[in-house]
Amino acid sequence: MATRFPKFSQDLAQDPTTRRIWYGIATAHDFESHDGMTEESLYQKLFATHFGHLAIIFLWSSGNLFHIAWQGNFEQWVSNPTGVVPIAHAIWDPHFGKGAVEAFTPEGGAGPVNAAYSGLYYLYYTLGMRFNSDLYQGSIFLMVLATVFLIAGWLHLQPRFRPSLAWFKNAESRLNHHLSALFGVSSLAFAGHMIHVAIPAARGQRVDWSNFLNTLPHPAGLAPFFTGNWGVYADPQAGPPILTFIGGLNPATGTLWLTDIAHHHLAIAVIFIIAGHMYRTNFGIGHSIKEILDAHKGPLTGEGHRGLYDTINNSLHFQLGLALASLGVVTSLVAQHTYALPAYFYMPQDHTTMAALYTHHQYIAGFLMVGAFAHGAIFFVRDYDPKANENNVLARMLEHKEALISHLSWVSLFLGFHTLGLYVHNDVMLAFGRPEDQLLIEPVFAQFVQVQSGKIIEGIPALFGGPGVTAPGEFLTGWLGSVNANNSPIFLPIGPGDFLVHHAIALGLHTTTLILVKGALDARGSKLMPDKKDFGFAFPCDGPGRGGTCDISAWDAFYLAVFWMLNTIGWVTFYWHWKWISIWGDNVAQFNASSTYLMGWLRDYLWANSAPLIGGYSPSGGTNALSVWAWMFLFGHLVWATGFMFLIAWRGYWQELIETLVWAHERTPLANLVRWKDKPVAMSIVQGRLVGLAHFTIGYILTYAAFLIASTAALYPNGPAAFTPAISAEQAKGVLSEFKAKPVPGGVMLLLPENIVFDFDKSSVKLDADPALNRVVGVIQFYGSEPVEILGHTDSLGEDAYNQKLSEERASAVKAFFEKKGIEAERLTAKGYGETKPVAPNAKPDGSDNPDGRQQNRRVEILIKTEVVPVS
């Protein structure tokens, strides 16, 4: 006889209604509530799932490696990392028509592909991989490892290999293992890989299994390591540096120094391996965590930390809450470090990938943090023992929870009214034609902190640190240069717009925290319902008969906090994205001017950057490489809006809807073959909220993901069929004005100064010239099929023949760039004039050199042969 779902609850399995399905899904992972579950079997099952989880991670990583090696273009990309678009995998989709196949097929490609925005190419390259064979080997290794871990998970569920409860409760041994083995040894292994493989690869030396054992990374061997003389490894006189303490970013790559990264991981390894031997285990030596906690009593803390050892050690929810909070903070830091201190070669030049990774990690951090508070609330309901925690810090926190909640409430109200008040005031001033009367507040405290960390800002003193204050030699040699370099990502220039959005984000963070803290601290009881813990609050939330009980459980706080968390992460990512596309596009002035009022955010960030999504596909315009994101943008809105149907409509509506749907289904021929035996009942309020929250969340993130990737890829094309959106006449006028365009006989002439496009005396287009040239591409596309001449010019220094050749090569390089962006080759002509057509004197009247004049003469001119010149 088949066992009805759910097997873990006989009560639910015998329920004759559809509640059986919904409650079964809702409690599938609530192992504590399952039939026959003991504390020991609970720990054993969770332990086994860890192996399964790791196996899935290894399998996922293996699949990434395998598909890039099989269907990607890794070796081609390695040969030109800034010029070749990385490919994630091929697309085999029977729904694709001719237009889609062409749009997603790169030039010279065999078929449609997906561009990679994951950053994996940059990771693999930085790790020292250079060939597809390296990727295949890594994939096979991880596949084997996944298999081993699956077997290990199964093995630890067998009676002979199940660890005992005492083994799980041995906190000191577990901590030693985590510190030494997991953190320490894994950091040591990574440092070893960096030193033996990645650093030599960056220097052009290949180290693989064939020469790994006989290729020394440093002539001094291990003697300096074990004698503590690590400085030898940084000394260029002693050999190629492998461990350094330079600081900042390598100016040649814009990323962290690999030798600094190796040093960091080796130091972490040593510290953690030592730390993992501090606690008392089998040998009776070392620290006892319980003794430390019991002895730790600070002022005004009552019994201090007495009782916390057993409270934490006996509560999986407490442990999970701590782990989720820690991981949430780390994940948000990863997002910040990805752009401020990037580690992977060439990734800072891939703007779409940088935007995707930042946003991805901030959203994950948000969910982890909300989860931390959710499990904190469950701890208070299920695991908290008031007698074991009398007058300790945990009990005292519960006793003064009203002070915590009221202070958070005050901070949230203050931030909300003042921040919104400033924004609205500025909107009113602009709407009434008085922009000069905006309230613009400089973030002087933040700028002061930047200066104390080494940044030089005129007018702000370095009182506690920085050049001239910190003792010579205390700053890392590379740090000051990196912090103060042009377009340094470490400390961005900030102004009134940053000040306002910073406080808007602070509002979101404090309000989210208020809801979560109140939900957790009130989980056992509140003024309204002091004995709340005695009522269970299972999923139905149809109440134990008291009014309002559906809105005061910890679950409801979690539910409401998710909306605020999403708002907050939305503001964070909006801010990051707009700030960075203005920096990449050398258009910081627009951000500074428009970010101080709400209409500026709506118009100049959201609406202006929606163009590639709104015009993503049409009967007349056809399909392009961003069409799928335009479709996803629409679909995300649909999912998000569906959420409101669940969130606003209540029980009576659901009862009618579900019964109507079931009645209709039961009268179809197919449904009569397999009769639906469960009696339909409406969802509970909580279930309706859960479904609504899921739709709202997924739609919200999907909509912004599509917007983020398509808008960034359109500005900085990094797709197999680069798409630059058509621009309006007004936008074309702005670009023409930016490049000092002027009407000339036969058309309009744009001026590209040398310093925007080329390095001095070079003919290859600079990496950071993309944004400027992309705007020119938009203007060329605006003019449809009009022919374009690209004219190169130099100054008079050097031989005539050399200058002629340089001017021709520069014109050809710009022509090649335009072709790569989709401008038809037959429209483009490249010509070089050398020094023959100066626009300013190369020498002053007295015969001396005229550097300003020579700089004006080193230029590329774009002549669009048209009669329509939208220049004011």
Curated annotation (Swiss-Prot):
Pfam families: OmpA, PsaA_PsaB. Keywords: 4Fe-4S, Cell inner membrane, Cell membrane, Chlorophyll, Chromophore, Electron transport, Iron, Iron-sulfur, Magnesium, Membrane, Metal-binding, Oxidoreductase, Photosynthesis, Photosystem I, Transmembrane, Transmembrane helix, Transport. Residues 1-717 are annotated as: Photosystem I P700 chlorophyll a apoprotein A2. Its EC number is 1.97.1.12. It comes from the Bacteria. GO terms for cellular component: photosystem I; plasma membrane. GO terms for biological process: photosynthesis. Coiled coil: none annotated. Residues 829-861 are annotated as: Disordered. CDD domains: OmpA_C-like. Chlorophyll a B3 binds at M645, Y653. PSI electron transfer chain: 5 chlorophyll a, 1 chlorophyll a', 2 phylloquinones and 3 4Fe-4S clusters. PSI core antenna: 90 chlorophyll a, 22 carotenoids, 3 phospholipids and 1 galactolipid. P700 is a chlorophyll a/chlorophyll a' dimer, A0 is one or more chlorophyll a, A1 is one or both phylloquinones and FX is a shared 4Fe-4S iron-sulfur center. It catalyses: reduced [plastocyanin] + hnu + oxidized [2Fe-2S]-[ferredoxin] = oxidized [plastocyanin] + reduced [2Fe-2S]-[ferredoxin]. The chain crosses the membrane at residues 46-69, 135-158, 175-199, 261-279, 316-339, 355-381, 403-425, 499-517, 557-578, 626-648, 690-710. It is a multi-pass membrane protein. One of its GO terms (molecular function) is chlorophyll binding. Chlorophyll a B1 binds at H637. Phylloquinone binds at W654. [4Fe-4S] cluster binds at C541, C550. Residues 745-868 form the OmpA-like domain. The PsaA/B heterodimer binds the P700 chlorophyll special pair and subsequent electron acceptors. PSI consists of a core antenna complex that captures photons, and an electron transfer chain that converts photonic excitation into a charge separation. The G.violaceus PSI reaction center is composed of one copy each of PsaA,B,C,D,E,F,L,M and Z, and forms trimeric complexes. PsaA and PsaB bind P700, the primary electron donor of photosystem I (PSI), as well as the electron acceptors A0, A1 and FX. PSI is a plastocyanin/cytochrome c6-ferredoxin oxidoreductase, converting photonic excitation into a charge separation, which transfers an electron from the donor P700 chlorophyll pair to the spectroscopically characterized acceptors A0, A1, FX, FA and FB in turn. Oxidized P700 is reduced on the lumenal side of the thylakoid membrane by plastocyanin or cytochrome c6. Belongs to the PsaA/PsaB family. The C-terminal extension has been suggested to be able to bind to the peptidoglycan layer. This is Photosystem I P700 chlorophyll a apoprotein A2. The gene is psaB.
